[in-house]
């Protein structure tokens, strides 16, 4: 009986340690991913797209819906990609599951890319079951989260990133403030208006 009790206690301890290790790994992955997205998404260009001929067209270099976000920004210096870049945050198939990926490539001209075949791809989170993106303009009297950003006059000031993985379930929501890059501030350049503070 003593041997059985000791064996049961050891198994229980091992299971507890495994759960703690999993929780620590999840927290570390969340911290790293959140920090990286804050640094990349936190600086967005307000530059207008070239070739706009209709008031019905989106004048900004931005495409934002519930499953994909495309924007122009700059990669933090420590990652080595200099200059303004097109970025794309979305889900992509990697192996037998989906992953949250960030794709980026140099902005050679102010026109949204039609394809991403030549882009660099970084896998941020693997084994993702669901991704939902929402956008908000904090400068409005009653800001509301929107699954698709359709404004032709303003860029969103915040993005809410919600995702769930197969192993850990739903992550805590990540809210990132999207601030205009120096030189693309519409208040200084006479372009369309951003909401919120600069």
Locate predicted features:
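Short aromatic-glycine motifs in intrinsically disordered, low-complexity regions
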Residues: 109-123
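Extracytoplasmic beta-strand-rich oligomerization domains located immediately C-terminal to a leader/signal peptide
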Residues: 10-109
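Structured surface patches comprising rigid loops and adjacent beta-strands/short helices at the edges
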Residues: 47, 119-135
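A short, structured loop/turn motif at beta-sheet edges
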Residues: 90-98, 123-130, 166-167
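Short linear sequence signals and composition-biased patches located at protein termini or domain-edge surfaces
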Residues: 129-198
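A short, surface-exposed interaction/processing loop segment used at functional sites
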Residues: 102, 107-112, 189-195
């Amino acid at each position: 009986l003593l041997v059985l009790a000791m064996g049961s206690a050891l198994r229980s301890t091992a299971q507890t340690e495994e759960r703690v290790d999993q929780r620590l790994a999840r927290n570390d992955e969340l911290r790293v991913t959140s920090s990286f997205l804050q640094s990349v998404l936190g600086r967005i260009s307000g530059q207008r797209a070239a070739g706009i001929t209709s008031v019905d067209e989106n004048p900004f270099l931005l495409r934002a819906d519930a499953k994909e976000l495309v924007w122009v920004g700059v990669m933090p210096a420590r990652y080595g990609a200099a200059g303004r870049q097109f970025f794309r945050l979305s889900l992509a198939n990697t192996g037998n599951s989906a992953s949250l990926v960030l794709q980026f490539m140099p902005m050679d001209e102010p026109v949204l890319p039609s394809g991403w075949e030549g882009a660099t791809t970084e896998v941020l989170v693997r084994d993702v079951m669901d991704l939902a993106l929402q956008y908000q303009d904090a400068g409005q009297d009653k800001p509301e989260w929107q699954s698709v950003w359709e404004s032709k006059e303003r860029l969103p000031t915040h993005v809410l990133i919600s995702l769930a993985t197969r192993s850990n379930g739903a992550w805590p929501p990540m809210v990132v403030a999207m601030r205009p890059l120096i030189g693309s501030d519409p208040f200084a350049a006479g372009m369309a208006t951003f909401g919120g503070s600069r």
